[in-house]
Swiss-Prot record:
InterPro entries per UniProt: Galactose-bd-like_sf (IPR008979), Kexin/furin (IPR034182), P_dom (IPR002884), Peptidase_S8/S53_dom (IPR000209), Peptidase_S8/S53_dom_sf (IPR036852), Peptidase_S8_Asp-AS (IPR023827), Peptidase_S8_His-AS (IPR022398), Peptidase_S8_Ser-AS (IPR023828)
Molecular-function annotations in GO: serine-type endopeptidase activity
Taxonomy of the source species: Eukaryota, Metazoa, Chordata, Craniata, Vertebrata
Glycosylation sites: N375, N514, N524
Function: Serine endopeptidase which is involved in the processing of hormone and other protein precursors at sites comprised of pairs of basic amino acid residues. Responsible for the release of glucagon from proglucagon in pancreatic A cells.
Peptidase S8 domain location: 129-453
Active-site annotation: D167, H208, S384
Name recorded for this polypeptide: Neuroendocrine convertase 2
Gene: PCSK2
């Protein structure tokens, strides 16, 4: 599988993004879903055309004039049988375009079978929910948890917030979920009806979404199962995984479903975590994401939470275009004693972590939540379990301040996540150029619900975001078999222009590169302030020698808050003893952030916090620059 972006950068809904394109050696699989555009006429005309040809139809909320036609009578993945229907649409003079959707794989993450407190709940599994309040259960480390108790004691339980679980459906009749189910915001895109109930199987395979829903919104004090992180929030089911193949139109429709009712979208799935796939959202889904962060929640932006991936040390989540998107909050996991789970992927785009299991055989070390048939389970695991926990914490923060934007939530995540007692056996904890501590696997640390809601209460919306192409290397450069190819780009970050980026949020290195063995490539990038981001680690199972990376946007959050101006360094080399060849064809530096200091106007209540440190840094920088401007002015007068 090959992934990348088309050569031009497109502007959609006020955001720059590259349209990812993918090529595969496998024969394409065609589905019973069509993207249709009419020459003229609105939704009524589309319904008329669809009915005449035996199709159902849905209007796409994020794209004017485009419709989703689906034909339940067509056998899925049968090109020959669907050809007649495709030709009928194409011959219809009212139809401008009829694009049959290709199918591709999307996998649930973490579907694995794993072998005294101030807040009292009568739910039978509550005392086993160590990730909520860790007192040392299942040989865990006391105090290593989400600190939800502090948020609850402050009165925040997720009331007024709706979380959409994009998955294989949820059992909305489950007695621990029924009272918090938001039917109006729910839909089944696999069956095209408003009832996202999971398809029961003998192996309980479709319990994934129900388990995720319980982590977020399971009711409290009802003597059933456990308690959700945001137990007074509402949960919506968006069923979209349970079909032979995924399509761009189903993903885009799910991600853009009811953006004025759904505040947070939780996704515990993605491309196959096999250590050799490079894949991400297609054009419609990218457009839907851009539309969501720009227009969702009344313009404050939909909040997308993504599981970082379960490929372990054999994979890298920067090869997953969902987890590495600027528009998602990518969440990794730790187990109850602070160690990494064996399936955890590391990458520079991960923003923070929550909890799951994947290392201990103790049956009570898993995540306790709701299950199919009205049951409960202690065996939920993977980063699948981590993402909904984060969605629950964000729901608590939104209740504290409904005015938070999608970017505010990312800033709060960076500032309130904590190292706590997390331990990465491979990558050390480091500080970036403005003193923020981060880890290549855990991001900025484990979420702290108490700290987040307290900061959210006083939070002022961060300044406007700008985008700058910091420079580009277009001449082909050979990567040596031993040693490294080292390139530099010096940028002023568009200073003096209206899109000047002074304080960084996200940085993308858009790279085109080929190698005799793609999985042996290692790519690092160092910022002007000296922060090294590992953009790509070795993936020993990836033996691709033909397609490489084509305009692939590797992303880092590790330079958050830094000054973008200066010299950036890119290093490419091979890991392993076998002789290798490679060619870097392009490196384009994309800078995203603000012109004005994002924390200057924020209220500081904890003078030991990262916010206090960052604000002090900003004030000193602003003072230094003011002095420099004054000196220049005096010298110019003389």
């Amino acid at each position: 599988m090959k992934g990348g972006c088309v050569s031009q950068w497109k502007a959609a809904a006020g955001f720059l993004f590259c349209v990812m394109v993918f090529a595969s050696a496998e024969r394409p699989v065609f589905t019973n879903h069509f993207l249709v555009e009419l020459h003229k006429g609105g939704e009524d005309k589309a319904r008329q055309v669809a009915a005449e040809h035996g199709f159902g139809v849905r209007k796409l909320p994020f794209a004017e004039g485009l419709y989703h036609f689906y034909h339940n009578g067509l056998a899925k993945a049968k090109r020959r049988r669907s050809l007649h229907h495709k030709q009928q649409l194409e011959r219809d003079p009212r139809v401008k375009m009829a694009l049959q959707q290709e199918g591709f794989d999307r996998k649930k993450r973490g579907y694995r079978d794993i072998n005294e407190i101030d807040i009292n709940m009568n739910d039978p599994l509550f005392t086993k929910q160590w990730y909520l309040i860790n007192t040392g259960q299942a040989d865990g480390t006391p105090g290593l948890d989400l600190n939800v108790a502090e948020a609850w004691e402050l009165g925040y339980t997720g009331k007024g917030v709706t979380i959409g679980i994009m998955d294989d459906g949820i059992d909305y009749l489950h007695p621990d979920l029924a009272s918090n189910y938001n039917a109006e915001a729910s839909y089944d895109f696999s069956s095209n009806d408003p009832y996202p109930y999971p398809r029961y199987t003998d192996d309980w395979f479709n319990s994934h979404g129900t388990r995720c829903a319980g982590e977020v919104s399971a009711a409290a004090n009802n003597n059933i199962c456990g308690v959700g992180v945001a137990y007074n929030s509402k949960v919506a089911g968006i069923r979209m995984l349970d079909q032979p193949f995924m399509t761009d139109i189903i993903e885009a429709s799910s991600i853009s479903h009811m953006p004025q009712l759904i505040d947070i979208y939780s996704a515990s799935w993605g491309p196959t975590d096999n250590g050799k796939t490079v894949d991400g959202p297609r054009e419609l889904t990218l457009q839907a994401m851009a539309d969501g962060v720009n227009k969702g929640r009344g313009g404050k932006g939909s909040i997308y939470v993504w599981a970082s991936g379960d490929g372990g040390s054999y994979d890298d989540c920067n090869c997953d275009g969902y987890a590495s998107s600027m528009w998602t909050i990518s969440i990794n996991s730790a187990i109850n004693d602070g160690r990494t789970a064996l399936y955890d992927e590391s990458c520079s785009s991960t923003l923070a972590s929550t909890f799951s299991n994947g290392r201990k055989r103790n049956p009570e070390a898993g995540v306790a939540t709701t299950d199919l048939y009205g049951n409960c389970t202690l065996r939920h695991s993977g980063t699948s379990a981590a993402a909904p926990e984060a969605a629950g914490v964000f729901a608590l923060a939104l209740e504290a301040n409904l005015g938070l934007t999608w970017r505010d939530m990312q800033h709060l995540t960076v500032l309130t996540s904590k190292r706590n007692q997390l331990h990465d056996e491979v990558h050390q904890w480091r500080r970036n150029g403005v003193g923020l501590e981060f880890n290549h696997l855990f991001g900025y640390g484990v979420l702290d619900a108490g700290a987040m809601v307290k900061m959210a209460k006083d939070w002022k919306t961060v300044p406007e975001r700008f985008h700058c192409v910091g420079g580009s290397v277009q001449d082909p450069e050979k990567i040596p078999s031993t040693g490294k190819l080292v390139l530099t780009l010096t940028t002023d970050a568009c200073e003096g222009k209206e899109n000047f980026v002074r304080y960084l949020e996200h940085v993308q290195a858009v790279i085109t590169v080929n190698a005799t063995r793609r999985g042996d490539l290692n790519i690092n990038m160092t910022s002007p302030m000296g922060t090294k981001s590992i953009l790509l680690s070795r993936r020993p199972r990836d033996d691709d020698s033909k397609v490489g990376f084509d305009k692939w946007p590797f992303m880092t959050t590790h330079t958050w808050g830094e000054d973008a101006r200066g010299t950036w360094t890119l290093e490419l080399g091979f890991v392993g003893s076998a002789p290798q060849k490679g060619v870097l064809k392009e490196w384009t530096l994309m800078l995203h952030g603000t012109q004005s200091a994002p924390y200057i106007d924020q209220v500081v209540r904890d003078y030991q916090s990262k916010l206090a440190m960052s604000k002090k840094e900003e004030l000193e920088e602003e003072l230094d620059e003011a002095v420099e401007r004054s000196l220049k002015s005096i010298l110019n007068k003389n």
